[in-house]
Amino acid sequence: MKIIRVQDQIEGGKIAFTLLKDSLAKGAKTLGLATGSSPISFYQEMVKSPLDFSDLTSINLDEYVGLSVESDQSYDYFMRQNLFNGKPFKKNYLPNGLATDVEAEAKRYDQIIAEHPIDFQVLGIGRNGHIGFNEPGTSFEEETHVVDLQESTIEANSRFFTSIEDVPKQAISMGIASIMKSKMIVLLAFGQEKADAIKGMVFGPITEDLPASILQKHDHVIVIVDEAAASQLD
């Protein structure tokens, strides 16, 4: 696990984009993408670059259950607004949050991942150490699955909704085992509220109580953090 400290999120996005360019030069074809505030500066770098992504496939980590793609709180909407409208890909995959059978949708998504192995996976990290929507206690062997969101995650995401009651209580998420199959992982974290999770991920025991700790076992992880998020690493 390599740690890169940056001044701010803008610099973090630039460094992540440089890593992506290196990966593309080596033949990367499938990107694993995340939502939330952490990767936005990275997506901004992608959109303003002259690179053509029309031969690439993207696979997103997760989607809320119960939100249509037209909902401005859906991750499908987020990705279109922040990346896909500005930079078309060959194909973009996200879980279908309105699937009538969400368990079958999870299995369908695993098949997509099997057909498109992820070369470059972007991650954020939750305050409780979750990656994707893999909450503390999630089995490291889990593949794509339906998640009951913890109160801390619902509270953290409520800033994007009119009220906390509007935050969906479930999501479909790529599993930890799915994430670990990625050839390369770039995790972005900014702000003091992420410091505990970053410390646990880097130095703590590998435990399902802190899902991101499993990344210690991955062969190619780069963590990009500002000084606030890195404040407990010294």
UniProtKB/Swiss-Prot annotation:
The UniProt GO MF terms for this protein read: glucosamine-6-phosphate deaminase activity; identical protein binding
Q: Where would one find coiled-coil regions in this protein?
A: none
Against InterPro entries, the record matches this protein to:
Glc/Gal-6P_isomerase (IPR006148), Glucosamine6P_isomerase (IPR004547), Glucosamine6P_isomerase_CS (IPR018321), NagB/RpiA_transferase-like (IPR037171)
Q: In which pathway does it act?
A: Amino-sugar metabolism; N-acetylneuraminate degradation; D-fructose 6-phosphate from N-acetylneuraminate: step 5/5
- Can you supply a Gene Ontology BP term from the record? N-acetylglucosamine catabolic process
Reaction(s) the record says it catalyses: alpha-D-glucosamine 6-phosphate + H2O = beta-D-fructose 6-phosphate + NH4(+)
Query: Can you supply one Gene Ontology CC term for this chain's record?
Result: cytoplasm
The UniProt record lists the EC number as 3.5.99.6
Instruction: Keyword check for Hydrolase, yes or no.
Output: yes
**What residues sit in the active site?**
D62, N128, H130, E135
Alphabetical keyword list: Carbohydrate metabolism, Hydrolase
| Classification via CDD domains | GlcN6P_deaminase
| Pfam families, A to Z | Glucosamine_iso
The protein's job, in short, is:
Catalyzes the reversible isomerization-deamination of glucosamine 6-phosphate (GlcN6P) to form fructose 6-phosphate (Fru6P) and ammonium ion.
* HAMAP family, A to Z: GlcN6P_deamin
Q: Which family does it belong to?
A: Belongs to the glucosamine/galactosamine-6-phosphate isomerase family. NagB subfamily.
UniProt cross-references to NCBIfam families, sorted A to Z: nagB
Q: What is this protein called?
A: Glucosamine-6-phosphate deaminase
Species this protein is from: Streptococcus pyogenes serotype M49 (strain NZ131)
Report the gene name.
nagB
